[in-house]
Amino acid sequence: MVPFFGDFPKIHIFVAQCRTTDEKGKIMTMIKNSCVLITGGASGIGRIMGRMALEKGACQVVIWDINEQNIAATIADFEKIGVAKGFRVDVSNNDNVIAAYEQTKRECGDVDILINCAGIVTGNKTFEKQTLADIERTISINAVAPMVVALQCLPDMIARDHGHICSIASAAGMISNPRMSVYAASKWAVIGWSDSVRIELSERKSNVHVTTVAPYYINTGMFDGVRSRFFPILDPERTSRKILRAIERNTDFRGIPWSYHFFRLCQGLLPVSWFDTIVGRWLGIYSTMDHFKGRK
């Protein structure tokens, strides 16, 4: 059995996910009265988004995380705001994920919103210095795990014809970056997979929505030591608010900051050598990982 933390009512009343429309008549996802599952939810922006979801009126927030102490501390804080529960889950272990989802359904009910936020980075290494263990773990947690978790939630969401899956990728999944090649590869995979699922659901007129988020470096400790010449390191509170707003608006793809969308355009129009010169040398993107330390 997967360990869990937090008291929870024995009797559950299912509350259907509420929908409303914005000023343009577009259907929005309501966090209020929704059950929100967040992987990597006991630290960083995962924890912040969990708190914000409760503040927005989520009927419950469920967090999956590998760190048992962080889970306990997070749930203690969350329970001051609303209903929360935590499970110790190794998202790189498929059997653990499957068992955790079944336990989550039994004890918490249906998941309305899934936020794939768990991730790791091993940086400041050129590719030939990466170990097989580094590669396997990074790809497993960053790329495979979001698919495996979504594979548990999505059939139930489709059956109910409502739900939302948000996957946190990275700006490194749009623009190549030296000394983080494996991390970049994992995030390119997330973007390609997540947006493809969005199209699959859209083509069948499903009310299940998919949002892919590609943020720049966020100041959470995960990227300690990163230096950015042109773009500021993102504030975790503001970034978390933008992600939740993207979910509410059913935004298909959200780059943070917005200027990264311009780089995507330039990447498609400019010769590779020109793009490398502008982004790598002038803007300094290719040297951001030179002094990377990461979370201790």
Name these PLM-found stretches.
Residues 68-69, 88-99, 132:
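The beta1-alpha1 cofactor-binding region of Rossmann-like NAD(H)/NADP(H)-dependent oxidoreductases
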Residues 170:
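Residue(s) in the substrate-gating loop at a strand-loop-helix junction
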